[in-house]
From Swiss-Prot:
One of its GO terms (biological process) is threonine transport. It is found in: Cell membrane. Pfam families: SDF (PF00375). This is Serine/threonine transporter SstT. It comes from the Bacteria. It comes from Enterococcus faecalis (strain ATCC 700802 / V583). InterPro entries: Na-dicarboxylate_symporter, Na:dicarbo_symporter_sf, Ser_Thr_transp_SstT. The gene is sstT.
Amino acid sequence: MVKAIRKLSLIQKIMIGIVIGTTLGFLVPEWTFISVLGELFVGALKAIAPILVFVLIIASLAQQKAGAKTYVGSILVVYLLATFLAAVVAVTASYLFPVKIVLEAAQEAQAAPTQLSDVLSNVLTSVVQNPIQAMIEGNYLSVLFWSSLIGIGLRQSSVATKDVIANLSTGITTVVQMIIGIAPIGILGLVFHSVATTGIAGLAKYGQLLLLLIGTMAVVALVVYPAIVFWNIRQNPYPLVFFVLKESAIPAFFTRSSAANIPINMELAKAMDLNEESYAVSIPLGATINMGGAAITITIMTLAAVHTLGMSVPIYLALLLSIIAAVSACGASGIAGGSLLLIPLACSLFGISNDIAMQVVGVGFIVGVVQDSIETALNSSSDLLFTTSVELADRRKNGEIIDVKALIGKSQLVVEQENI
C-alpha cells in the first residue's frame, strides 16, 4: 500500500487528499483538528518563501557575470500587459452579462485606499522597508530590492564566499522540496476547513456573481494568456498552459496565497531548466506585479455595484476603469486584504460613496471563499507561464529549436523523481 502511494505523482496524491478532505468535511465537520494540517502547511510555505527568495536572488546575482543575459525586463512588460488585458476582458464580460448584487449593511473592514496615489505611495514605501522585517511580513518588493542590492554588492567577493552562499541556497531549496512533499496532507486540511465552515449553501445566494467571476478568469486563463504565450513561442501554447495549470494552479487554488506558491513555481522553473538568474527574480516579482485575477475581481465587483445602482457608464470611463484596475491590482499584494480593499478606489471613479463601496467589499468577502482561490491560482500560475514563455521566445529568436512537449515531459519526470 505504502509503495503504491509512493509511486503516485504529487498531483495524484493531492487529488486523493482533496477527495478525503471533502468527504470528511461533509461527514464530520466537528473534527476541527484536521484543519490544523492545512494551517501548518501554508504556514511552513509562507515562512520559507521569503528566505528562499532572499537567498536565491543573492546567490544568482553574486555569481552573475557582467553582461549575463536575463529576461526580467521582458517578463515585466508581459506581466503588465496581461494584467491590463485581464481588466479589459472583465469590463467586456460585465457589459455582456450585467450582474446586480444585494447591498446590505456594510461589513467592517480595514481602511481602504481612496486614491491611486495612495496605492503607488504604499508600494514605493514598502520597497525600502527593513529587509529583516520584510521577510517576517512577506513584503516581496522589499525582499527583491535588498537581495538584489546585496547580490550585486557580493559580485566582487571571493570564490569561497560565493560557494558558501551557493551551498546555503541549495540547503534551503532542499527544505522547500521537503515541505512541498507534504502538500497532499496540507491540502487535505485546507479542503476540510473550507467544506466544514462554508459548505455549498453559503455561496448559492451569489451564484450569478460567482459564475461571472469564474467565467471571466477562465476566459483569461484559457484564451487571453495562451494568446500571449503563442505570440512568444509561435507554436501551440496549450501543452505549456495545461502543464502550468496542473502543477502550479492547483496548489495555489488551495493555499490561496501567491507567496506560499512561490517555492512551488521556483521548483517547476528549475525542473524546466530555465535561467535561474531570471526566474529567481521574475517569479517573486510576479507575486506582486502580475495580478490579472485581482484586476478582474476589482473590475467586475465595481461594475456590479454600478449596474445595481442603475448608472450608465460611457466607454471612455470603462477604459479608464481598466487602466485603474490594472495599476491598482499591481499593488494588491502590498495592501492588507488584497484586491477586495481596492474596490472602493475603483468605485470612487463613478462617484459611488464609500459606504456603498464597503458593502460591495462585504459581498466580496462572502464569495471570496471561491473567488480568492481561483484568483490566486490564475495569478500565481501565470507567473511561471510568462516566465517560461519569454525565455523560450528568446531561445527561438536565437535559432534554437523549441520543443515544448519535450520540455514539459522532462520537467514532469524531474518533479516526480524529487517527490518520490
